[in-house]
Amino acid sequence: MNRARDELGAHMSIAGGLSLSLERGREVGCGAVQIFLKNQRQWAAKPLAADEVRQFRAARRAHAIRHVFAHSSYLINLGNPNPALWSQAVDAFTDELERAEALGLSCVVIHPGSHMGAGLEAGLARVTAALDESVARTAGYRVKVALENTAGAGNTIGRTFSELVALLERAARPERLGVCLDTCHLFAAGYDLRTPAGYRRAMAECDATVGRGRVLAFHLNDAKAPLGSGLDRHENIGRGLLGLTPFRLLLNDRRFTRVPKVLETPKEPEPSADLRNLAVLRRLRLRRRLGR
């Protein structure tokens, strides 16, 4: 398979300019690239310049990277019970959707957030209201929102498929929403993907709740922390507690062949870490894909 045309890739740095992320992706053979849209440690950022947009779109064509999407800033908590901080989060997320639309990205991945002790139901209500507001402000946009499953630590929302589907079902415009599944987070939340039976159970639950057609992206990460630990600790593919089996099963599951899958594994040493992890993943493919 032509590496520039498959659905595998990695999160890439935007240091020096958005378009450089795509050049970095090409250098390690990405067919998919995830980026931050701005410095993810800061709330404010200067508006996108028309030249930046043109350069980014030209670089994407030149490097033949099929799938490009974004991850939102980690500062954003759509479940914040504080009204002022909630409004700040909504404004920031709306800005990210606007940037993603200008760049022609497919979706923006976001952690649903934390209820910060207010309780799960209150948190779900706050996140739903935030998503509805951001989507309403970007009416007519093509870019989608991908809710990422969480590892389950503390007061985070989105640990289970049932929590994710609660957000999807309550949304005013559910057609703009989907999910991004992180393998490390699934394992940390208690989904044991290490056997074919465990993988089938998890994907069956996903299909029965969220629906496989709403899976917009995958984060492929091995795990440093034990099953059900709630700890978000990423490891290189095959070198953590998940092992290779979950990745082999996913990469040969034809239900998800066209869904982009990116690494969020340790980057050191660069770029050899990404090169190694992508090579491991590509070797796991079978000529005959598995499917149910």
Predicted regions, residues:
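N-terminal pre-domain/capping segments
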Residues: M1-S72, I76-E98, R287-R292
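Gly/Pro-rich active-site loop or hairpin
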Residues: I157-V165, F187-R258, S272-L275
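Active-site beta-loop-alpha junctions enriched in small/polar residues
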Residues: H11-A15, K38-Q40, S72-L75, G113-H115, ...
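C-terminal helical cap(s) of enzyme catalytic domains, especially alpha/beta-barrels
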Residues: P271-L290
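Non-cysteine beta-strand/loop elements that form the S-adenosyl-L-methionine
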Residues: G31-F36, R66-A70, L177-T183, R212-K224
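Acidic (Asp/Glu)-rich catalytic clusters
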Residues: N2-R3, E23-C30, L48-F69, E96-G104, ...
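Active-site acidic/histidine proton-transfer and metal-coordination neighborhood
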Residues: L78-G178
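Conserved, mostly hydrophobic/aromatic
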Residues: G25, H71, A89, A100, ...
